[in-house]
Amino acid sequence: MSYPLFLITWEFKSLSCHKHKEIAYKNKLRLKLSQFIFSCMLRKNDESAVNEESLMSKEIVIVGAGFAGMWTALSAARLAKLKKADDISVVVIAPVAELRVRPRFYESKVQTLVSPLMPVFEAMGVKFITGNVTHIESEKQLVVYVDENQNLVTKHYDRLVLAAGSNLRRDMVKGIAEHAFDLDQIDTAAVLEQHLNGLASKPSSQARNTVVVCGGGFTGIEIATELPARLKALLGESEPVRVIIIERNGQIGTNYSQELQDVIKQATDDLEIEWILNAQIEEITAHGLRLCSGEEIQSDTVIWTAGVKANDLTNVFAKQQGPQGRLHVESSLKVVDQSNIFATGDVAYAATDDKGNHALMSCQHAILMGKFAGHNVAASLLDCDYLPYKQENYVTCLDLGSWGAVFTEGWDQKVKSVKEDAKKIKIAITNELIYPPKAELDLIMEQADPLAPWV
């Protein structure tokens, strides 16, 4: 639906004379303006979207440059090279051409936890567009993105791969957006790190020395177990620090095996981390938080780690959405009921085996899913057979701060290693294994093969 531009402009001017009108109304007008511009762009591109260049080549457009997006691009380019298909172009659209190593965002010096992608993209002939995709028009085979100059641009695709990742939910409890820190993106993790580094300049108090972690899942446990040593280093060994994990379930690590739960409990006990179980948070404030039980905890640092959802672009395909907004996909990772759109990584709800297990929102699954998605999206243009995505092996490697780590194998999470031995495995995974390969053609071709050995 489009709106007359003069009417929208008049409404904006009218608002300047009526300051008492709600800000929400002005936001609605911005949305109308965006929709109007978008509809104009679609009409303009309806006849000309397939330009002279695209008539000569077929374009695979990948939205996102995380673990799944990177490997999708490299794998698609790999198959095109193997088939000598010079008419296939692989294009990645993302805000920045770097892999941001999200599994390490609980660590210090977070802004260094990135790896450039242009070397590997250039080695494989992958094109990169700096932009943030805001709309998908599947019937017209168009994506709309905001470029680095804040212009709206349309891009035609022959095949589209959604690899846009996931985001933390900030609407679950009052006060999250205003008062809580998080590790969701590198920028927000950097804000938390800056805040922690600044605590030493504040007078010693119970609130200053107390950190509350909301959510006792993987991310919550890793940041909580990291904090005691970090706080002592920042505030002084003699300062009494307190780290609390708020968990809504009645036991530690509800979704983990009993064996893994026992290790987590031992580690957090040894680190003197407190758990508050069966707890619901009513509100996060500038001075801490209040539980639904009425208990208040004074803290200058509340970290939110609970609740993740797939990128909002999945809302375009509402009929295909499953748990956490992820898209139901076939074994090829093609979105159900979509002829030329694939999904991978956090946005895809994909079966890993025939036993009822599904890929988690983790780099472990995103990396291999990306390789399969890339192969299959290229195969769909080359009239090659699909490779059905399977990932029967599953491991868990949970960092437990200065205590060490724990490493498990299988969906039943049998503990195989703990403490320092597990820590070495964790470091090898997060500091080496998950990073992009060296920008060497033969090496990339080998590692981008979805059937190459992986975890």
What are the functions of these language-model segments?
Residues 350-392, 397:
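A conserved FAD-binding loop/helix module that cradles the flavin
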Residues 53-130, 222-255, 303:
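Beta1-alpha1 glycine-rich phosphate/pyrophosphate-binding loop at the start
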Residues 42, 50-58, 126-210, 303:
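FAD-binding core/adjacent interface of flavoenzyme oxidoreductases
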Residues 194-240:
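Rossmann-like NAD(P)H-binding beta-loop-alpha module
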Residues 21, 28-37:
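N-terminal amphipathic/hydrophobic targeting modules at extreme N-termini
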Residues 402-455:
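C-terminal auxiliary extensions adjacent to catalytic cores
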